[in-house]
From Swiss-Prot:
Molecular functions (GO terms): DNA-binding transcription factor activity, RNA polymerase II-specific; RNA polymerase II cis-regulatory region sequence-specific DNA binding; zinc ion binding
Name used for this protein in its record: Zinc finger protein 100
Keyword Isomerase: no
Residues in KRAB domain copies: 35-107
Entries under CDD domains matching the protein: KRAB_A-box (cd07765)
Chain intervals annotated as zinc finger (C2H2-type): 177-199, 205-227, 233-255, 261-283, 289-311, 317-339, 345-367, 373-395, 401-423, 429-451, 457-479, 485-507
Listed GO biological process terms: regulation of DNA-templated transcription
Family the UniProt entry places it in: Belongs to the krueppel C2H2-type zinc-finger protein family.
Keywords annotated in UniProt: DNA-binding, Metal-binding, Nucleus, Repeat, Transcription, Transcription regulation, Zinc, Zinc-finger
Underlying gene: ZNF100
Amino acid sequence: MDDPRYGMCPLKGASGCPGAERSLLVQSYFEKGPLTFRDVAIEFSLEEWQCLDSAQQGLYRKVMLENYRNLVFLAGIALTKPDLITCLEQGKEPWNIKRHEMVAKPPVICSHFPQDLWAEQDIKDSFQEAILKKYGKYGHDNLQLQKGCKSVDECKVHKEHDNKLNQCLITTQSNIFQCDPSAKVFHTFSNSNRHKIRHTRKKPFKCKKCEKSFCMLLHLTQHKRFHITENSYQCKDCGKAFNWFSTLTTHRRIHTGEKPYKCEECGKAFNRSSHLTTHKIIHTGEKPYRCEECGKAFNRSSHLTTHKRIHTGVKPYKCTECGKAFNRSSHLTTHRIIHTGEKPYKCEECGKAFNQSSTLTTHKITHAGEKPYKCEECGKAFYRFSYLTKHKTSHTGEKFYKCEECGKGFNWSSALTKHKRIHTGEKPYKCEECGKAFNESSNLTTHKMIHTGEKPYKCDECGKAFNRSSQLTAHKMIHTGEKPYKCEECGKAFNRSSTLTKHKITHTGEKSYKWEECGKDFNQSLSLIKQNNSYWRETLQM
């Protein structure tokens, strides 16, 4: 029912109608008298409040706080904060004591709820209306309607004959409504009807604008406000608009840097209460979201959702360029850079650029020489956590990924993928400069340095530079005298794994290199080269 003083419903106006509608409301506001909080407020008795479920109570709190903020926004001045709002802000139950007493002794005048909030059917089904509806069956002799009203259902009811009316109201109030499936008892038509709808799971109330359905008219009415007040609240700093004043308030904290929600455990602050709630789980170690498939638990529902895709194989994020699909949006974003060739993350130390921030972070460690990830088994340290994880399998001997072609096992799927290229001969990484192709991207990156002459890995001790970090690591052992690669057969140690491999051949007698010219075998490629040179010298002298 539209408020006749303002020419439109108070709730719509208070929500901040777009453009001309808001201007018209402001004009009406000053011409026809101020709109008070009582005009847009709803109060409950304890009995009525307890009949609402938790979702309805939460919706009520949100709507009342929003109505008050809208009213302050409309008035443009500070208003005296109503007790109801103070109660809601403090998280207390907002039922009204005076109203509770009125319901205990049935009211002479029925409460008038704003139609735009509770809607037509909800108004008719309110607690007092239900009583009056029952009483209406016995005749309206004892009731006098307000001027201009057509029926009891439309208007406020005035007392004319106290005793008869009160007696009738007390009698009708004794009627209760019971739901057969759950034997739950209700004191109002509305709560009984709403409860029954939940058993049928029907959603009879449909939004004409977006076709979304609801089981309660109240929820539909609340939903409609999103369409009516679309982008009504605009941020003065960046121009971004929002449907809710509360959303704008939260957004403003990005500009102000305000973080009102502080963790009592560690002092870390957040700009949203939900972020604080999520953060607290770190301290408790709680992981309430568990995968039914494998039992793995997570502290965020979003993490569980992403994890489930491993089992289902769903990859909803597809690259429009090549058709490749991913189970995470972040993976798709990273993948797209392959097509663009963009490398936005640049190292300030050596100028090298990367397509991922995480790769740059890892790269920076090579300059610092820092190796924060240490193996508890042997003490070896790594500058990447993934390298440590991979290294640990050398102690366990675990190899999850097996090549179907040759039976060789690997502890990483990526290592198996690279290995398979040996059998297929695939070399997907091609140098644009000379056309040479490689089966690993890292080999192409190293190869490109031949053309550029770049040697980003420099020894702090002697200044010698290298184009591979592994070469620098091996070189540093010359200065430190470290020889980590030890022969189990004779105990001799070496500073390179390749040197140890060559040394082991002296014990096995293996000769891997054969010269096709004379059929002679050698245990080192260098010996083969020397023999080749000797052969040609002898040939030339003949």
